[in-house]
């Protein structure tokens, strides 16, 4: 049976899922610490696992290792069974949809690495390796930014010198688009509507919010890079740009080093010394300020986007790692959203759920939901759609 491989490559890691034609997950896992000492962890449909350490000098060795493991565990007999490979690509600039990868497309992904150096280059490197290891498979690029190309100019323009945009492509792009696309499609099904209006909070280690009107993105909190917007695990979110120059002068750090600090040493970590929301919530009350700063930022964006939708809102939706699991965070956020008169049902949080659940009560003027996102299945479906 034909199989589809979904790959999410980072600067030093590769996450993957392997699907059959019926959207069943046959295997999943990751290779990490590429370029360092190498580690892998794989899970298979039959419940077996394979994990340990292995030298991964580059992404090529990591990919070769995971493909050999699929054969060793009889998930596939030959690489030719993998007929399509979907690649998550963070920066797609003006691509409005996922696309089959041609030499010209791959060249453009490399070129766009100047906008997303931490992401696009390793993603393009992995695409290049996959094309050589599985030459007959069709490769599809699925861009984080594509879903947000529907944003109007008023949402994506920065008030900056025109030359910055025209020559250097500086504008707001938005990210987590594949997750927002999945949640939007899911709500069209759940509510039996052709188009929906939603405020979606994608709260994970990376976090953002999107305003969805008529099933299209009209605004989102991440901007030119994923650094803008909400407080995140290690990212600062919104900050006065002058801070970068000031800290560089005060500490003799380069601009790159200061930006690196805003990406890797800020957010929850900077406020509390904990990058994981589970650690923040388990160390209350000493981390209360961190919780308040985080949830206030989320609440402020919810109100901002509800205003921009300017129509009946079908739901306020929480998704991703924190949004799907941290009930306290949802309660704290809703407590700070005063103007919308949202009311939660305490008993709803006690119910287990597989895919989604409604959290608001009958008195609430806005329905609140938790939904488990599934970016991988969207990538898999794009591969099937574009490979026909």
UniProtKB/Swiss-Prot annotation:
Q: Where is the active site?
A: 144 (proton donor/acceptor)
Can you supply one Gene Ontology CC term for this chain's record?
cytoplasm
* Chain positions recorded as Mg(2+) binding sites: 8, 375
Q: Is Signal one of the keywords?
A: no
Q: Where does ATP bind?
A: 15, 202-206, 276-278, 321-325
Q: Which InterPro entries match?
A: Ac/propionate_kinase, Aliphatic_acid_kin_short-chain, Aliphatic_acid_kinase_CS, ATPase_NBD
Q: Name one GO molecular function term.
A: acetate kinase activity
Q: Could you read off the lineage of the organism from its UniProt record?
A: Bacteria, Bacillati, Mycoplasmatota, Mycoplasmoidales, Mycoplasmoidaceae
Q: Which residues bind substrate?
A: 88
Does Kinase count among this protein's keywords?
yes
Question: Which stretch is the leader sequence?
Answer: none
Main function: Catalyzes the formation of acetyl phosphate from acetate and ATP. Can also catalyze the reverse reaction.
Q: Which UniProt keywords apply?
A: ATP-binding, Cytoplasm, Kinase, Magnesium, Metal-binding, Nucleotide-binding, Transferase
Cofactor or coenzyme needed: Mg(2+); Mn(2+)
Please identify the protein, giving its name as recorded. Acetate kinase
The protein's site described by Transition state stabilizer is found at 176, 235
Q: State the source organism's domain of life.
A: Bacteria
Task: Identify its protein family.
Answer: Belongs to the acetokinase family.
Q: How is the cofactor bound?
A: Mg(2+). Can also accept Mn(2+).
Reaction catalyzed: acetate + ATP = acetyl phosphate + ADP
